[in-house]
Every structure is written in C-alpha cells, then in structure tokens.
C-alpha cells in the first residue's frame, strides 16, 4: 500500500496500521485483566486474594452504586487511599447509562464521581464483570520490558511488512487494592 500510494501520489491507507494498534491495545488489556495463566501470571480479574464482591443486578435501582461503595469501604477498611479506577465490561457499562430516580443523573455519572473520574469500559473483562482498583504505585504497576516498537521486516509482493513488539507485565503488589465484582 505504501509503494502504491507513492507511485500514484495518493495518501497512504492507514487502516491496517489502525487495526494493528487496536489489536495491540486489546492484547494489553487482556493481559492486564486476565493475566496469562499458561505463563503463571495473574490479571486484575483473576488475582488470588483479591477482594470479591458478589455483584447484584446493576440494571436495577442503585445496585451498582451500592456495590461500588462496598468496594470503596473495603479500601477504607484496609487503609488504602489514592486514585481509584473502575473498569467494567461493555454490558455493565450499558446498564449504567440510565437516569437515577430523583437525581437527574446517569448512574455512570454518579459512579464516575464516586471513584474520582476513573470509569472505564473494556471488552477484556468479558461479560458481567467489573474490577475496582486503588491505582497507586505501591499497590500495582505495569512493568515495561520493551515499550511498544515497530520494526521493518521487508517488502513482499509490493507490501511492506512490519512487526509490532512489546513486553509488559502487570505487577500486583497489594491484592487488597483489587476488588472484583462478579
């Protein structure tokens, strides 16, 4: 595509580049949330010793808000303070997009305010799951061995081939800083 674009003077089609970047982001999210059981690494949603909250029906009443408060109470009980982040599966994120009676606010807005702005949706959690973390470096971090790089592999059949490479590992230092809703 690069060669053809150069020859005819047209802009390069970056669709494949965008798709590759998206695939890398999805794999990184999967590593962070599910870990790599084959290699013996835990993810946030699979960590042994993480605090588990039996999730109520988030499509009803203020159940989601109440469940998140339970998670934050756990952090308070364990004296964990700092930045909080809540990651939810796409189906749960959709359930949070409804007005709460007598507040005039979406439940997602209330929860986002409760956790200090850190509300994220990720397909890496699958369905009907959420993870709340106290995202401070003393609790967890992402160890980067090799940051994301792109290497030129050569050309074949008028296409230029590249390899995208990264090594990273989630390091959970304090499992009390992870709350799994499921």
Pin down the residues of each PLM region.
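Sequence/fold signature of self-assembling virion shell proteins
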Residues: 99-182
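Residues forming anionic-ligand binding surfaces in small-molecule and nucleic-acid pockets
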Residues: 1
């Amino acid at each position: 595509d690069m060669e053809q674009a150069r020859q005819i003077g047209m802009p390069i089609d970056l669709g494949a580049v965008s798709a590759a970047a998206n695939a890398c982001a999805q794999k990184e999210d999967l590593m962070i949330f599910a870990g790599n059981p084959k290699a013996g690494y835990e993810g946030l949603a699979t960590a042994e010793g993480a605090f588990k909250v039996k999730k109520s029906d988030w499509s009803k009443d203020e159940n989601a808000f109440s469940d998140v408060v339970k998670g934050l109470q756990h952090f308070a009980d364990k004296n964990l303070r700092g930045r909080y982040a809540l990651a939810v599966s796409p189906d749960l994120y959709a359930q949070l997009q409804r007005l709460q009676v007598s507040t005039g606010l979406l439940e997602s807005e209330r929860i986002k305010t409760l956790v200090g702005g850190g509300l994220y949706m990720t397909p890496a959690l699958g369905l009907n799951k959420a993870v709340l973390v106290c995202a401070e470096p003393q609790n967890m971090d992402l160890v980067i061995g090799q940051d994301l790089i792109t290497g030129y592999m050569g050309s074949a059949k008028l296409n230029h081939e590249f390899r995208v490479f990264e090594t990273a590992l989630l390091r959970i230092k304090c499992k009390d800083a992870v709350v799994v809703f499921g």
